[in-house]
UniProtKB/Swiss-Prot annotation:
Pfam families, per the entry: Phospholip_A2_1
Active site, UniProt feature: 48, 92
Record carries keyword Secreted: yes
Name recorded for this polypeptide: Basic phospholipase A2 PA-10A
Protein location: Secreted
GO cellular component: extracellular region
Keywords in alphabetical order: Calcium, Disulfide bond, Hydrolase, Lipid degradation, Lipid metabolism, Metal-binding, Secreted
SMART domains in UniProt: PA2c
Family to which this protein belongs: Belongs to the phospholipase A2 family. Group I subfamily. D49 sub-subfamily.
Cited CDD domains: PLA2c
Annotated catalysed reactions: a 1,2-diacyl-sn-glycero-3-phosphocholine + H2O = a 1-acyl-sn-glycero-3-phosphocholine + a fatty acid + H(+)
Record organism: Pseudechis australis
One record GO biological process: phospholipid metabolic process
Amino acid sequence: NLIQFSNMIQCANKGSRPSLHYADYGCYCGWGGSGTPVDELDRCCKVHDDCYDQAGKKGCFPKLTLYSWDCTGNVPICNPKSKCKDFVCACDAAAAKCFAKAPYNKANWNIDTKTRCK
């Protein structure tokens, strides 16, 4: 679920940036998404959105699905339990790892999505 995703982000980035900083970044980080991602971090969010879409097509509810995971050496590791839980956990873990590698450009936080995300 979204709280677990937030915790995974903190695991992967070693707590260097609050999870909320990703909630309104670029065209895809946060609710919804459209247009072309503005940078590598925004592409991470688009891939995560697409992964959640795939989870939904499998009958899962990714924003609400609780799963089991551990933070081992600043790497989120999923503990498989069921199809939906494992799929959603994998979406979140991949995004958290992607966020940790991608540069954060403050200029892409809280952008005007109506003009920048076409």
